[in-house]
């Protein structure tokens, strides 16, 4: 009898409510350590990041599998928290280890310092997406530590190269280890809560169900090399400039996407006009790089024979990328200019927003933010979600924080950061999601 009482007592202790003060402290310290790992892509060497996750999971008795996908430390990770109902397929919590490069001169602090200042934690990847990765990791660790068994298996999946298209990350894993990712749902980065992006003064929380297609293009112009002191009509630089101007003059995008209609209904019929809301309603083109010149360092007095630029084009779901590029070539209409697609297109339909998981996300958001208007959302940037949507899996973008426009603007920019209070709430929201039955 005494032994039975001890067993029952230990079970009750194991399943107690988490000590959230302790969880918050652990989560913040972990994020600081994670931000101090410069997992920049290129080269996407994610070994140190993967080892950090593996060590934290091991502390609570969870095994992490590491998958080497490339020769330069490109490591993907999978860990599984077992659930009760084995008839249900898992929920995949997906995040990525890699981050984009930084312009150190433009930061007021070390971008890989994990610095806490002014109520925020600063560093490359804080928003995209190491902060969310730690929310997912801490939700899994906390469930295990406190003896809480989820309804279904939870698979934590961290990838090495989302920032370069996922060829060694999600695509590689789906090709080589598909059984590890045989799931019913995927939860990724994407939607977020805001009071000043969709409509000022109104708390709207988006769950992303669709995103624009990245169509990265290289435009190359050819000309005649010459001495800079003697201008010529066949100057590759001038040809490139004219081609870019014509390329950027893209026609209107056409009819409204159904997800945008849902977002408009959520905000009362009209969204504020800003770079985010403008981008999600039309095809966009951004000139991102220019490359020209001869020599290293480049000689000012030499007219080069070639010049090139890259355009980051983002197309609405359903837009035919080949037709878009063909129309661009026709506008340029110059045999000296080539337009080349340099990325893989992932055009997939929107994920349904009537699933049990979507309703669970809505319920969790409303529990923590009762005044929030919850809506499906389209995002202008790309994630790894379409690679699962292409296979028929519902994939949702869920960034469980309320973020301001200035904070959102730090993604892929300088002084990247997230508010610490929202980070802590995000850990609890992620925990509530994976603890739920859906």
Could you describe each region identified by the protein language model?
Residues 3-12:
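Sec-dependent N-terminal signal peptides
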Residues 14-16, 192-431, 435-438:
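Metal-dependent amide/peptide-bond hydrolase catalytic core
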Residues 175-192:
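A glycine-rich helix N-cap at a beta->alpha junction
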Residues 97-99, 158-166, 189-194, 225, ...:
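Acidic, glycine-rich active-site loops and adjacent beta-strand->loop/helix elements
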Residues 32-40, 54-63, 141-145, 178-179, ...:
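Sec-exported extracytoplasmic/periplasmic mature domains
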Residues 16-104, 306-310, 322:
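N-terminal helical capping/dimerization or prosegment-like subdomains
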Residues 17-21, 36-44, 121-126, 226-230, ...:
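Second-shell loop/turn segments in exported
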Residues 87-158:
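Active-site metal-coordination/substrate-binding segment of hydrolases
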């Amino acid at each position: 009898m005494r032994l039975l009482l001890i067993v029952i007592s230990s079970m009750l202790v194991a399943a107690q409510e988490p000590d959230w003060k302790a969880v918050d402290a652990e989560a913040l310290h972990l994020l600081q350590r994670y931000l101090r790992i410069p997992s920049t892509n290129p080269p996407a060497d994610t070994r140190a990041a993967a080892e950090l996750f593996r060590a934290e999971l091991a502390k609570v008795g969870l095994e992490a599998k590491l998958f080497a996908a490339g020769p330069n430390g490109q490591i993907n990770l999978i860990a599984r928290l077992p659930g009760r109902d084995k008839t249900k397929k898992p929920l995949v919590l997906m995040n990525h280890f890699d981050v984009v490069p930084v312009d150190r001169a433009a930061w007021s602090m070390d971008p890989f310092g994990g610095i806490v200042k002014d109520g925020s934690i600063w560093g490359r990847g804080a928003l995209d997406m190491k902060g969310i990765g730690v929310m997912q990791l801490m939700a899994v660790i906390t469930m295990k530590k406190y003896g809480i068994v989820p309804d279904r298996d939870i698979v934590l999946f961290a990838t090495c190269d989302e920032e370069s298209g996922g060829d060694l990350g999600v695509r590689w894993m789906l090709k080589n280890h598909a059984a590890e990712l045989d799931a019913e749902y995927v939860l990724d980065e994407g939607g977020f809560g805001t009071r000043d992006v969709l409509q000022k003064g109104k708390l709207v929380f988006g769950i992303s169900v669709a995103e624009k297609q990245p169509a990265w293009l290289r435009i190359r112009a050819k000309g005649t090399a010459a001495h800079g002191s003697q201008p010529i009509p066949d100057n590759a630089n001038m040809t490139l400039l004219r081609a870019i101007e014509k390329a950027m003059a893209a026609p209107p995008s056409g009819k409204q996407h159904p997800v945008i209609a849902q977002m408009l209904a959520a905000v009362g019929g009209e969204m504020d006009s800003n770079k985010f809301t403008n981008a999600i309603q039309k095809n966009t083109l951004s000139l991102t790089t220019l490359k020209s010149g001869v020599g290293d360092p480049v000689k000012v007095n030499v007219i080069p024979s070639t010049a090139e630029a890259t355009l980051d084009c983002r197309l609405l779901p359903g837009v035919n990328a080949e037709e878009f590029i063909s129309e661009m070539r026709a506008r340029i209409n110059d045999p000296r200019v080539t337009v080349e697609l340099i990325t893989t297109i992932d055009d997939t339909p929107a994920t349904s927003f009537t699933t049990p998981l979507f309703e669970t996300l809505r319920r969790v958001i409303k529990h923590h933010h009762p005044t929030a208007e919850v809506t499906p959302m389209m995002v202008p940037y790309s994630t790894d979600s379409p690679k699962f949507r292409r296979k028929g899996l519902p994939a949702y973008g869920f960034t469980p924080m309320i973020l301001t426009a200035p904070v959102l603007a730090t993604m892929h920019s300088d002084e990247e950061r997230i508010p610490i209070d929202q980070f802590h709430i995000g850990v609890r929201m992620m925990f509530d999601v994976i603890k739920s039955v859906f």
